[in-house]
């Protein structure tokens, strides 16, 4: 991590983009799964 930190400034924006993509997919997925599970329990 220390190696190529200031030598590779292109690696920084990619990490941010990846973080946004992962969270953009993971948060709604977890919310959807939670909502479905809640409905299953509320149904009965």
Curated annotation (Swiss-Prot):
Topology of this chain in the membrane: Single-pass membrane protein
Record-listed heme binding positions: 23
Cofactor note: With its partner (PsbE) binds heme. PSII binds additional chlorophylls, carotenoids and specific lipids.
Cofactor needs: heme b
Compartments where found: Plastid, Chloroplast thylakoid membrane
Gene Ontology annotations for the cellular component aspect, listed alphabetically: chloroplast thylakoid membrane; photosystem II reaction center
Transmembrane feature ranges: 19-35
Pfam families documented for this protein: Cytochrom_B559
Keywords, in A-Z order: Chloroplast, Electron transport, Heme, Iron, Membrane, Metal-binding, Photosynthesis, Photosystem II, Plastid, Thylakoid, Transmembrane, Transmembrane helix, Transport
Principal place of residence: plastid
Gene Ontology molecular function, alphabetical: electron transfer activity; heme binding; iron ion binding
One record GO biological process: photosynthetic electron transport chain
Highest taxon of source: Eukaryota
InterPro entries in alphabetical order: PSII_cyt_b559_bsu (IPR006241), PSII_cyt_b559_CS (IPR006216), PSII_cyt_b559_N (IPR013081)
Function field: This b-type cytochrome is tightly associated with the reaction center of photosystem II (PSII). PSII is a light-driven water:plastoquinone oxidoreductase that uses light energy to abstract electrons from H(2)O, generating O(2) and a proton gradient subsequently used for ATP formation. It consists of a core antenna complex that captures photons, and an electron transfer chain that converts photonic excitation into a charge separation.
Subunit structure: Heterodimer of an alpha subunit and a beta subunit. PSII is composed of 1 copy each of membrane proteins PsbA, PsbB, PsbC, PsbD, PsbE, PsbF, PsbH, PsbI, PsbJ, PsbK, PsbL, PsbM, PsbT, PsbX, PsbY, PsbZ, Psb30/Ycf12, at least 3 peripheral proteins of the oxygen-evolving complex and a large number of cofactors. It forms dimeric complexes.
Stated family: Belongs to the PsbE/PsbF family.
Name of protein: Cytochrome b559 subunit beta
Originating species: Gracilaria tenuistipitata var. liui
Protein's gene: psbF
